[in-house]
Amino acid sequence: VSGGEVTAGAHRTAVWDVLERTRLCSFPFPPQGHCPNFNGARDAAKNLLSHPQMAAHRTLIVGPERALMPLRKLALQSGLTLYVPHQKKEGWYWRLTGPLGARLSQMPAVGEPRLKPEGAQAVVLACVAADRQGGRLGKGYGWGARGLHLGLPEYTLAHPIMLSAQLPCAADST
């Protein structure tokens, strides 16, 4: 999904439509308005976590999106500490250290509320589209929509349909 001069909104819509039409996404449906929970997210999470740049990190900030749940689960199972934004307290995070914390519904029971993501070494944000230069296009609003700007490396997960050589519009974050 690419072309000439395209707005970010038009590119998001094109990606969402292709994912829906080709049935390459899972709950929540429809994918429009979300960072899609794409088929293959678990494999993408495994690949990212095993990448040499990521393997050295022990503490991550990870978005709350459903597409990132496999990454949260795998990271917690391998002993990483995660900070996930608190859904009801803006600016707060859940500090998570056990696999039960991968699910948003379990975070209040197993997580520790924290104001700052202490010791975080990298960020993983969900996306609607990404490019090979590191550009990321989120859903256009909400937590992490424009990146976090914490001076930490930021990563994302994407289905090949969501990935292009270069975004046809300005990236939300890089």
What are these regions (language model features)?
Residues 60-76, 80-86:
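Extended, H/D-rich, highly charged conserved domains that either
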Residues 1-35, 46-57, 78, 90-174:
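Surface-exposed, charge/polar-rich loops and edge strands
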